[in-house]
């Protein structure tokens, strides 16, 4: 929930703008979201971005947290749990991919039975999360392949991957089979999706829609001005970008 608005004000503004779901909702607000008639599109699967799935000594803790959150997600109708690779350590990238995949595989079965997808989030290690391991799409795809479960997929954060590798549309088109969720944000600054930043979100969203993607595109940006107006403008402009786009 953004600091610029109280939770109830934000939820009312989001619904009025036309949004159907709220992303990354902390548990204390779940009832509020449901009472507003909105869906919760994702929540955190486990604690700690830095100490994550790329460390075998963290797997027992993370499995315990994920199993508890899988049960809660099933109870509250939350389709996605966000997971983190953790920061780089002594393991090579290849070794860390195997370790991360093994950690996700430990809980992919219970998650699938509950109708929950485990999202490995791709973050940038250049600006916001120094040392984070899952900082390139290719590494994330390798983890998904190694995990060998249809419900272990990627959270492709457009802002983060623009910083790390660019070539956003072509990457999305190539990797869409392993992407289950998107985050947006203007670059630089993670602010509004407007002309002051470098990403062409109209083209990106149209490309996503053209693939037939049917999951959530969650807006994770910090508005520079009135958050209510930002919500309304973003929903309207994204709708215009998708108008008339036909999936393949």
Each language-model region and where it sits:
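Catalytic domains of carbohydrate-active enzymes, especially glycoside hydrolases
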Residues: 8-30, 69
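Active-site-adjacent beta->alpha loops and helix N-cap segments on the catalytic face
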Residues: 27-38, 91
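Active-site-proximal loop/turn and secondary-structure-junction residues that shape catalytic pockets
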Residues: 2, 26-28, 46-49, 87-89, ...
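Conserved beta-strand positions in the central sheet of alpha/beta enzyme cores
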Residues: 21-23, 41-44, 82, 119, ...
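Active-site acidic/histidine proton-transfer and metal-coordination neighborhood
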Residues: 52-153, 163, 246-248
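Histidine-acidic metal/acid-base catalytic patches
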Residues: 1-15, 77-79, 139-156, 160-248
């Amino acid at each position: 929930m953004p600091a610029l608005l109280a939770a109830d004000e934000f939820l009312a503004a989001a619904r009025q703008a036309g949004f159907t779901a709220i992303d990354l909702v902390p548990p204390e607000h779940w009832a509020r979201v449901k009472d507003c008639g909105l869906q919760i599109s994702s929540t955190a699967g486990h604690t700690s971005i830095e100490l994550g799935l790329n460390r075998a000594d963290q797997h027992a803790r993370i499995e315990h947290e994920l199993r508890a959150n899988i049960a809660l997600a099933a109870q509250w109708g939350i389709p996605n749990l966000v997971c983190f690779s953790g920061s780089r350590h002594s393991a090579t990238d290849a070794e860390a991919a195997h370790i991360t995949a093994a950690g996700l595989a430990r809980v992919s079965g219970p998650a699938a039975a509950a109708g929950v997808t485990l999202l490995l989030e791709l973050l940038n290690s250049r600006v916001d999360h120094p040392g984070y391991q899952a900082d390139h799409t290719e590494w994330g795809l390798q983890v998904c392949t190694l995990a060998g479960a249809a419900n272990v997929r990627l959270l492709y954060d457009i802002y983060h991957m623009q910083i790390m590798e660019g070539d956003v549309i072509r990457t999305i088109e190539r990797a869409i089979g392993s992407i289950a969720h998107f985050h947006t944000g203007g670059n630089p600054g993670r602010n509004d999706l407007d002309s002051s930043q470098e990403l062409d979100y109209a083209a990106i969203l149209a490309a996503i829609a053209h693939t037939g993607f049917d999951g959530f595109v969650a807006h994770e940006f910090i508005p520079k001005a009135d958050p209510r107006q930002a919500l309304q403008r973003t929903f309207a402009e994204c709708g215009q970008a998708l108008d008339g786009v036909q999936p393949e």
